[in-house]
Regions:
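Non-catalytic, conserved peripheral segments adjacent to functional cores
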Residues: 1-92, 111-144
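Short beta-strand His + acidic residue motifs that chelate non-heme Fe in jelly-roll/DSBH
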Residues: 19, 96, 104-109
């Protein structure tokens, strides 16, 4: 059973414009945020793993595929791990909540897509908890 959760938000539209909210998401534990600007749809960013760091992903512009795996062995993970794949879009207000112990890999569906990433660790706390794996592991990105 997956430990990843998705919090659904709301989008309100009227003649004045649009409000996207995450009223059911609580920012408890968030210490840092950053924004990824994805230049085009051919770039695959990842795999980046974090043994102790939690992450949250929210699409600000365009759309993304976010793939996640729970890593079984940080030094030599199984090539047979099954990825969980989530699609995020500016058309839907939803945030993917990733517990510690996962690796992530992302790809934009649309040129110039923008992804907000939140973390429960400061840069200093996260410095020793960054694991990199080949982007071709676990997901066939030609399908996305």
């Amino acid at each position: 059973m997956s430990k990843v959760t998705v919090v659904e938000g709301e989008i309100y539209r009227d003649a004045r414009g649009q409000i996207s909210s995450l009223n059911n998401f609580h920012f408890e534990g968030v210490k840092r945020c950053y924004i990824i600007h994805h230049p085009d749809t051919s770039v695959v960013r990842g795999w980046n793993g974090h043994q102790f760091e939690r992450k949250w992903f929210y699409c600000l512009k365009g759309s993304f595929t976010v793939a996640l795996v729970e890593v079984d062995n940080w030094e030599n993970p199984s090539q047979e791990l099954e990825a969980e794949v989530y699609n995020l879009s500016e058309q839907e207000s939803r945030i993917v909540c990733v517990p510690a112990g996962y690796a992530n890999c992302i790809k934009a569906f649309e040129k110039d897509s923008i992804l907000l990433v939140l973390s429960d660790k400061t840069m200093e706390e996260a410095a020793g908890d960054s694991w990199k794996y080949d982007k071709n592991l676990w997901v066939d990105w030609s399908k996305y």
